[in-house]
């Protein structure tokens, strides 16, 4: 019933909006195992729900950001006086969210065990790149009724993780899937990378050293460290927090230090 769905979305707007304002993310969403699009051939992929995002992100506090409706019933957006995204749709398409089927098939009782991240992926119907955290929604009896989660966009991550100047060179920050000895840049979120050649493409091969780790694609080399997180992507690859310094700037510092010591 579309009216019932819209009423439920309106009731859940306040906790969703409050979470968006308090959490470190660029969007927040939920999708229930129900749809108003029952006549469509792929109706099983659609989830009624609400997806709120920041629009025109600026390096400022959450309370000063504009919130728009990316997914949700038109009646919900109108009644809440929410601006609708120019790529708005009334429902979420679960088929376009990697791993959402695994989340909704979860049979445990501990929510943290049912959480999954996507790698860096294109937000449906937009040019933006995001990582999505998906969490199962359980009812009082422990049955999964859908999924909810948070979005981290590439712009949000970049604004939130600026370059950190140091004597060794500018320190860069990443959130990246690491598969064995390979850091998967194509699935990573990059902080501000001004002045470096680091892009979200390709693979950095990892070599452990005594004091630091080397990351290289054969042309560009970085020195740094990474810490595996208690999280994995939908296909089971661990996520890591990574800090890098371009090898060239570190070698310049090293050479300068040796000259100063000699003098």
Model-derived features: where do they sit?
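Tryptophan-centric aromatic hotspots in well-structured domains and transmembrane helices
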Residues: 27-40, 103-121, 237, 250
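Extracytoplasmic/periplasmic ligand-binding sensor regions of membrane-associated signaling proteins
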Residues: 67-149
């Amino acid at each position: 019933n579309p009216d019932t769905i819209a009423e439920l979305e309106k009731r859940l707007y306040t906790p969703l909006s409050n979470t968006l304002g308090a959490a470190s993310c660029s969007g927040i969403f939920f999708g229930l195992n129900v749809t108003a699009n029952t006549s469509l051939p792929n109706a099983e992929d659609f989830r009624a729900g609400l997806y709120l995002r920041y629009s025109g992100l600026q390096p400022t506090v959450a309370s000063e950001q504009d919130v728009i409706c990316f997914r949700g019933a038109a009646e919900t957006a109108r009644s809440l006086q929410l601006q609708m995204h120019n790529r708005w749709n009334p429902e979420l398409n679960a088929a376009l969210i990697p791993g959402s089927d695994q989340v909704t098939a979860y049979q445990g009782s501990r929510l943290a065990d049912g959480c999954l991240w996507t790698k860096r992926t294109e937000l449906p119907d937009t040019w933006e790149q995001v990582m999505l955290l998906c969490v199962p929604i359980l009812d009082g009896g422990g049955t999964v009724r859908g999924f909810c989660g948070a979005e981290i966009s590439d712009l949000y991550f970049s604004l939130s993780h600026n370059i950190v100047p140091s004597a060794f060179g500018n320190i860069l920050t990443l959130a990246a899937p690491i598969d064995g000895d390979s850091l998967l840049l194509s699935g990573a979120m990059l902080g501000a990378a001004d002045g470096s050649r680091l892009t979200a493409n390709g693979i950095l091969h990892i070599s452990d050293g005594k004091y630091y780790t080397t990351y290289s694609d054969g042309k560009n080399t970085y020195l740094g460290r990474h810490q595996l997180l208690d999280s994995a992507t939908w296909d089971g690859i661990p996520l890591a927090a990574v800090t890098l310094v371009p090898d060239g700037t570190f070698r310049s510092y090293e050479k300068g230090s040796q000259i100063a010591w000699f003098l």
